Amino acid sequence: MKLATPRWWYLREGAPSPITRALLTPLSWIWAAQTARRIARTTPRGADCAVICVGNFTVGGVGKTPIVRELLLTLTKRGRRAHGLARGYGGKLKGPVRVEPSRHTVAEVGDEPLMLAQDFPMWVSRDRVLGARKAAASGAEVVVMDDGHQNPDLRKTLSLVVVDGETREDEWPFGDGRVFPAGPMREPLNVSLGRTDAVIVLLPADLPEADPRLLALFGDTPVLIARLEPAAPPPKGRQVGFAGIGKPWKVERALKAAGCHLVDFAPYPDHGQYDEATLNFLWERAQTYSAGLVTTEKDWVRLPQAWRDRVTPWPVRARFEDEGALGALLESVGL
């Protein structure tokens, strides 16, 4: 059974009680030590192409997939043969396999690769090195890897880390800074930052600017600001929303900020599958309010085919505020 991301992970005060902190802290020490040991003992292997890693410091969703999409689009516009690469979380295929939307399903390749494959060459591979090499053999000049900052197997040309820029209502992207499971961090921030070429702070569309206190944490590491913006207006009329992403409450907030008449919202675990019972519950809920159903593109591709006409997917896109700075960063590694 998939578990939802604890909201307290992303609150400044962290765990809701001292007892919870005390119970989880020893497990955090073990997790951090294992991560450090794996990275220290692994010699990265290369592929016959450049590799841009889009990772994160934390467990849970920060908006990597929209950034991966925007980077693939930017590289393609710059004349580069760019392919995407993902582990295929939630899919059963080990790969390496090129994702074909007309043939593959979410159960085989995962939701994010299937979504990205609608627009770009996309590969799924549990072994990132084999996946990157397969992409290179198929003509890729550069591979954009979704996640993998803590995976030392594949040598990176550029390591980018996406940070959720939401800091309102006592939210903080790193919580109280504790490592999983006592907090959201995959490893201590200073350790992870040491392997980072640039940080991408992803802001909600309605947040005026990045929090200076957050930016100060990154020291001399270059920071790019991007915004997660609607690619289309939300559906008109009353709507019941639902989402199964790392931080589903952000979808609810974004829909309301975009002007959606949201009468109810249901959060679900990240990458979870929607069975008939769940979908019937949502449909009946919408009928109670005389409302439609709206969800994210990522959730929509996980719906059974028979349900897709009943649910409106709401697309969002990442936009870099300073495209020149992004271009300079890519040029610095020959891209």
Swiss-Prot record:
Lineage: Bacteria, Pseudomonadati, Pseudomonadota, Alphaproteobacteria, Caulobacterales
Main function: Transfers the gamma-phosphate of ATP to the 4'-position of a tetraacyldisaccharide 1-phosphate intermediate (termed DS-1-P) to form tetraacyldisaccharide 1,4'-bis-phosphate (lipid IVA).
EC number: 2.7.1.130
Record-level GO BP terms: lipid A biosynthetic process; lipopolysaccharide core region biosynthetic process
InterPro entries recorded: LpxK, P-loop_NTPase
PANTHER family associated with the record: TETRAACYLDISACCHARIDE 4'-KINASE (PTHR42724), TETRAACYLDISACCHARIDE 4'-KINASE, MITOCHONDRIAL-RELATED (PTHR42724:SF1)
Gene: lpxK
Residues binding ATP, per UniProt: T58, V59, G60, G61, V62, G63, K64, T65
UniProt KW keywords: ATP-binding, Kinase, Lipid A biosynthesis, Lipid biosynthesis, Lipid metabolism, Nucleotide-binding, Transferase
Superkingdom: Bacteria
A molecular-function term among this protein's GO annotations: ATP binding
Coiled coil feature spans: none
A single GO cellular-component term on record: plasma membrane
Protein name (database record): Tetraacyldisaccharide 4'-kinase
Assigned protein family: Belongs to the LpxK family.
Annotated pathway: Glycolipid biosynthesis; lipid IV(A) biosynthesis; lipid IV(A) from (3R)-3-hydroxytetradecanoyl-[acyl-carrier-protein] and UDP-N-acetyl-alpha-D-glucosamine: step 6/6
Reaction catalysed by this enzyme: a lipid A disaccharide + ATP = a lipid IVA + ADP + H(+)
